[in-house]
C-alpha cells in the first residue's frame, strides 16, 4: 500500500486534524484524491483545504503590499526602516501613547494591520507580543496629561512620537510616520497619509502603542492622574527599562 493510499484509509477527522487544523503540508496528490473520494466528508475537507490555500495566497499578497514603502527604501540602501504611530489618548483621560518599531526585512506576520481594524483585543495583544518578539527593536513613548493641557493634544501626539523614536535602541536609517513628521528627528523621514493601513512598519507601531495591557500597567505605576509615567523600551535582548 502506497503512502497516499495509507493516508486515504484514515478516518476523515484524523485527516482534518493533520492537514486542516495543523500547519502540516498536504502531500502531493492527496488533495486531488480527496476531491474525487466518494466520501462526502473527504470532499468537504478538500474544499476547505482549497479555501485555506486561497486565503493564504490572498493574505500573502496583502502583506506584501503592506511592504511597498519599506521595499522601496530597502532597495535604496536604507536597511533599518522604522515605523512610528500615535495611538491616541489612553482611557480615563490618560497620556497620549506612541509606538516605534523596526521590523526585519521582508517581515510578514499574518493578521498585521492598522490597529483600528483589529477589533478583537486578544488578537491585537497576540500580534503585539509577536511583533515585540520579532522586531529588531521597538519602543513606546508617552505625553503626559499635564503636557496635553499645556501644548494641546496634537502637539502632545508629536511629542509622544518623538519620545518613542528617541528611545529606539538602534538608530533608524529612515522613518515612516503616520500622516505627520516628527520634530527634531535625527533620521530622514516621510509622513504617509493613512500610513497605519499602508505600511507594515507603521501598522506594527500602531499595534504596539495600543496594547490592551498598557492601561493596567499605567494604573499600577501611576494611580494618581498626572503622575509622570515611564517611557518603555524593549528589544530582543533587553528587559523593560523605565525613564
Language-model regions: role of each:
Residues 1-82, 89-243:
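RNase H-like, Mg2+-dependent phosphodiesterase core
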Amino acid at each position: 500500500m502506497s503512502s497516499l493510499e495509507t493516508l486515504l484509509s484514515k478516518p476523515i477527522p484524523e485527516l482534518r486534524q493533520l492537514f486542516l487544523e495543523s500547519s502540516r503540508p498536504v502531500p502531493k496528490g492527496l488533495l486531488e484524491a480527496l476531491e474525487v473520494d466518494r466520501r462526502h466528508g473527504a470532499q468537504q475537507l478538500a474544499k476547505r483545504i482549497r479555501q485555506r490555500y486561497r486565503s493564504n495566497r490572498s493574505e500573502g499578497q496583502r502583506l506584501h503590499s503592506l511592504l511597498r514603502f519599506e521595499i522601496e527604501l530597502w532597495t535604496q540602501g536604507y536597511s533599518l526602516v522604522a515605523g512610528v504611530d500615535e495611538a491616541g489618548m489612553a482611557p480615563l483621560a490618560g497620556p497620549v501613547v506612541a509606538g516605534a518599531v523596526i521590523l526585519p526585512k521582508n517581515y510578514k506576520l499574518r493578521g498585521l494591520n492598522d490597529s483600528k481594524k483589529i477589533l478583537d483585543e486578544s488578537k491585537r495583544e497576540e500580534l503585539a507580543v509577536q511583533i515585540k518578539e520579532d522586531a529588531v527593536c521597538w519602543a513606546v513613548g508617552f505625553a503626559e496629561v499635564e503636557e496635553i493641557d499645556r501644548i494641546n493634544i496634537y502637539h502632545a501626539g508629536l511629542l509622544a512620537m518623538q519620545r518613542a523614536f528617541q528611545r529606539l535602541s538602534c538608530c533608524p536609517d529612515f522613518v515612516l510616520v503616520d500622516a505627520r513628521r516628527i520634530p527634531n528627528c535625527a533620521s530622514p523621514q516621510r509622513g504617509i497619509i493613512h500610513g497605519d493601513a499602508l505600511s507594515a512598519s507603521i501598522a506594527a507601531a500602531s499595534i504596539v502603542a495600543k496594547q490592551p495591557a498598557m492601561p493596567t500597567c499605567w494604573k499600577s505605576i501611576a494611580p494618581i492622574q498626572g503622575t509622570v509615567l515611564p517611557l518603555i523600551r524593549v528589544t530582543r535582548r533587553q528587559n523593560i527599562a523605565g525613564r
